[in-house]
């Protein structure tokens, strides 16, 4: 990784993920984590203190070692293991977790289809994928701006994409979306169309 990706992006990620407007989304998602929980893209660990006693163990996978170092100080009361690795090749056995959590992660993973296939592989039958992500807006005017801005945004924001159709991608990987809430969060519309929901392994 270059200097910008290696040194600057981790701090930008940490700062952006501490936005107070994201906190209610995080709390809703983390509080639903049950059993053995796998968090994809644990980042600097913002979700770690939010898991409840419904979770018996949290496994946090993150490709960036600097972010993992930041996450270590955020571990809450639930037993937690931090793992350096990628979502496209999750270092866990098949059908080994009860819950997968992603919060503002699917926008950035390079091979999103492969990553979602991996998430499905490690989930137990009937296991749940809990997600909150920003992505493609249903409004044509906003979509045009997302498409225009995406090439530049992706470069400055560590690979983040503004225009991924989140639920379509999840369902294409073999999940059934059982709960979904969509809408704009406060802020520039190309950046703030949110998808929050639950999907089950089919």
Describe the residue ranges of each PLM region.
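Short alpha-helix
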Residues: 158-174
